[in-house]
Amino acid sequence: MEQINIEIAYAYPHNHYLKSFTLDAGTTVQSAILQSGILAQYTDIDLRKNKIGIFARPVKLTDVLKNGDRIEIYRPLLADPKEIRRKRAAQQAARQKGKI
């Protein structure tokens, strides 16, 4: 059977997991994740909650992998990006007001 080479990536702010695997052609995203053993190593990953992508493009667990794909397992956001921008803008406005 034909083989494909893929990578699986999972990142924290100060460290990351990136490993290469050789799998059978026709392997799905979910099957590759399960075969990799990453779920045992990082127990905070929940395939029902964590979003999955290939090169920053969202994918389904049932999608079939292609040679060279990099599966990325995304962590949930800890803060709302819009709220962070609002706070930063308010702080900057307060600093500007204080300089005048």
Curated annotation (Swiss-Prot):
Transmembrane segments: none
Family, as annotated: Belongs to the UPF0125 (RnfH) family.
Pfam families assigned to the protein according to its UniProt record, in alphabetical order: Ub-RnfH
Protein's name in the database: Protein RnfH
Top-level taxon: Bacteria
